[in-house]
Amino acid sequence: MSNYGWLKTFLMFVMAFAMQSSVGDWLKILDVGPDFVVIFIVSVALRHGAATGCFWGFLAGFTLDVYAPVEWLGANAIAMTIVGFAVGQLEEHFLTLNLPPKVGVLGLAFFVNDMFYFLITGLEKDVVTTLFITRTVPECIYTVVIGGILFYLISGKKSNV
Protein backbone atom coordinates (compact mmCIF):
# COMPACT_ATOMS: atom_id res chain seq x y z
CA MET A 1 0.00 0.00 0.00
CA SER A 2 1.40 3.39 -0.98
CA ASN A 3 1.74 6.35 1.35
CA TYR A 4 -1.39 7.82 -0.22
CA GLY A 5 -3.19 4.52 0.44
CA TRP A 6 -2.20 4.58 4.12
CA LEU A 7 -3.36 8.18 4.45
CA LYS A 8 -6.65 7.37 2.74
CA THR A 9 -7.18 4.36 5.03
CA PHE A 10 -6.33 6.43 8.11
CA LEU A 11 -8.88 9.05 7.07
CA MET A 12 -11.46 6.27 6.62
CA PHE A 13 -10.53 5.04 10.11
CA VAL A 14 -11.11 8.50 11.61
CA MET A 15 -14.33 8.87 9.64
CA ALA A 16 -15.61 5.47 10.87
CA PHE A 17 -15.10 6.52 14.49
CA ALA A 18 -16.63 9.94 13.87
CA MET A 19 -19.66 8.32 12.25
CA GLN A 20 -19.91 5.80 15.10
CA SER A 21 -19.93 8.63 17.63
CA SER A 22 -22.25 11.03 15.83
CA VAL A 23 -24.28 9.52 13.00
CA GLY A 24 -24.52 6.17 14.77
CA ASP A 25 -26.42 7.81 17.62
CA TRP A 26 -28.84 9.47 15.21
CA LEU A 27 -29.48 6.21 13.36
CA LYS A 28 -30.33 4.24 16.50
CA ILE A 29 -33.71 2.55 16.52
CA LEU A 30 -34.79 1.14 19.90
CA ASP A 31 -31.22 1.65 21.17
CA VAL A 32 -29.79 -0.47 18.33
CA GLY A 33 -27.45 1.12 15.79
CA PRO A 34 -25.03 0.13 13.05
CA ASP A 35 -21.37 -0.58 13.80
CA PHE A 36 -19.35 1.58 11.41
CA VAL A 37 -16.06 0.32 12.88
CA VAL A 38 -16.79 -3.29 11.87
CA ILE A 39 -17.84 -2.07 8.42
CA PHE A 40 -14.48 -0.27 8.16
CA ILE A 41 -12.46 -3.32 9.23
CA VAL A 42 -14.28 -5.64 6.83
CA SER A 43 -13.90 -3.25 3.90
CA VAL A 44 -10.19 -2.71 4.56
CA ALA A 45 -9.53 -6.43 5.02
CA LEU A 46 -11.44 -7.32 1.85
CA ARG A 47 -9.57 -4.74 -0.16
CA HIS A 48 -6.03 -5.09 1.22
CA GLY A 49 -5.76 -8.58 2.74
CA ALA A 50 -5.08 -10.24 6.06
CA ALA A 51 -2.03 -8.32 7.29
CA THR A 52 -3.62 -4.93 6.70
CA GLY A 53 -6.95 -6.12 8.10
CA CYS A 54 -5.15 -7.43 11.17
CA PHE A 55 -3.33 -4.12 11.70
CA TRP A 56 -6.41 -1.93 11.32
CA GLY A 57 -8.52 -4.39 13.31
CA PHE A 58 -6.11 -4.18 16.21
CA LEU A 59 -5.87 -0.39 15.99
CA ALA A 60 -9.66 0.00 15.82
CA GLY A 61 -10.25 -2.46 18.65
CA PHE A 62 -7.64 -0.85 20.87
CA THR A 63 -9.09 2.58 20.14
CA LEU A 64 -12.55 1.30 21.10
CA ASP A 65 -11.13 -0.17 24.30
CA VAL A 66 -9.55 3.15 25.27
CA TYR A 67 -12.39 5.31 23.95
CA ALA A 68 -15.24 3.45 25.66
CA PRO A 69 -15.35 2.73 29.39
CA VAL A 70 -14.58 -0.98 29.32
CA GLU A 71 -13.35 -3.15 32.17
CA TRP A 72 -11.65 -5.59 29.82
CA LEU A 73 -8.93 -3.56 28.10
CA GLY A 74 -7.86 -5.47 25.02
CA ALA A 75 -11.02 -7.49 24.45
CA ASN A 76 -12.11 -5.40 21.45
CA ALA A 77 -8.53 -5.33 20.16
CA ILE A 78 -8.28 -9.12 20.11
CA ALA A 79 -11.78 -9.64 18.69
CA MET A 80 -11.34 -7.11 15.89
CA THR A 81 -7.83 -8.35 15.07
CA ILE A 82 -9.28 -11.84 14.58
CA VAL A 83 -12.04 -10.44 12.37
CA GLY A 84 -9.59 -8.40 10.26
CA PHE A 85 -7.30 -11.39 9.79
CA ALA A 86 -10.08 -13.88 9.00
CA VAL A 87 -11.84 -11.62 6.50
CA GLY A 88 -8.52 -10.75 4.84
CA GLN A 89 -7.63 -14.45 4.54
CA LEU A 90 -10.98 -15.20 2.95
CA GLU A 91 -10.47 -12.55 0.30
CA GLU A 92 -6.84 -13.37 -0.49
CA HIS A 93 -7.07 -17.13 -0.71
CA PHE A 94 -10.51 -18.08 -1.93
CA LEU A 95 -12.24 -15.68 -4.28
CA THR A 96 -12.87 -12.10 -5.19
CA LEU A 97 -16.26 -11.28 -3.78
CA ASN A 98 -19.03 -9.29 -5.41
CA LEU A 99 -21.66 -7.40 -3.41
CA PRO A 100 -23.94 -10.13 -1.93
CA PRO A 101 -21.08 -12.28 -0.56
CA LYS A 102 -19.36 -9.17 0.83
CA VAL A 103 -22.52 -8.33 2.75
CA GLY A 104 -22.68 -11.93 3.99
CA VAL A 105 -19.05 -11.75 5.12
CA LEU A 106 -19.86 -8.50 6.95
CA GLY A 107 -22.71 -10.21 8.83
CA LEU A 108 -20.53 -13.20 9.72
CA ALA A 109 -17.70 -10.89 10.81
CA PHE A 110 -20.08 -9.00 13.08
CA PHE A 111 -21.18 -12.24 14.77
CA VAL A 112 -17.58 -13.45 15.12
CA ASN A 113 -16.54 -10.12 16.63
CA ASP A 114 -19.33 -10.18 19.22
CA MET A 115 -18.84 -13.85 20.08
CA PHE A 116 -15.09 -13.42 20.65
CA TYR A 117 -15.75 -10.31 22.72
CA PHE A 118 -18.26 -12.20 24.88
CA LEU A 119 -15.85 -15.13 25.20
CA ILE A 120 -12.90 -12.93 26.20
CA THR A 121 -14.86 -10.92 28.76
CA GLY A 122 -16.10 -14.13 30.38
CA LEU A 123 -19.77 -13.25 30.53
CA GLU A 124 -22.11 -15.91 31.88
CA LYS A 125 -24.07 -18.09 29.47
CA ASP A 126 -27.49 -16.59 30.25
CA VAL A 127 -26.13 -13.05 29.90
CA VAL A 128 -24.55 -13.92 26.54
CA THR A 129 -27.80 -15.47 25.32
CA THR A 130 -29.78 -12.40 26.33
CA LEU A 131 -27.24 -10.04 24.74
CA PHE A 132 -27.15 -12.16 21.60
CA ILE A 133 -30.91 -11.98 21.16
CA THR A 134 -31.44 -8.37 22.24
CA ARG A 135 -28.28 -6.69 20.90
CA THR A 136 -26.17 -8.80 18.54
CA VAL A 137 -28.86 -9.96 16.12
CA PRO A 138 -30.58 -6.55 15.71
CA GLU A 139 -27.25 -4.69 15.46
CA CYS A 140 -25.99 -7.25 12.94
CA ILE A 141 -29.05 -6.77 10.74
CA TYR A 142 -28.72 -3.00 10.94
CA THR A 143 -24.97 -3.12 10.26
CA VAL A 144 -25.48 -5.42 7.27
CA VAL A 145 -28.09 -3.08 5.77
CA ILE A 146 -25.92 0.04 6.23
CA GLY A 147 -22.78 -1.85 5.17
CA GLY A 148 -24.51 -3.17 2.06
CA ILE A 149 -25.48 0.36 1.07
CA LEU A 150 -21.93 1.61 1.68
CA PHE A 151 -20.37 -1.34 -0.23
CA TYR A 152 -22.74 -0.64 -3.13
CA LEU A 153 -21.80 3.05 -3.19
CA ILE A 154 -18.08 2.24 -2.99
CA SER A 155 -18.26 -0.40 -5.74
CA GLY A 156 -20.33 1.92 -7.95
CA LYS A 157 -17.79 4.70 -7.52
CA LYS A 158 -14.91 2.30 -8.20
CA SER A 159 -16.40 0.99 -11.45
CA ASN A 160 -16.95 4.50 -12.85
CA VAL A 161 -13.27 5.40 -12.52
Give each language-model segment a name.
Residues M1-V161:
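Terminal, non-globular segments
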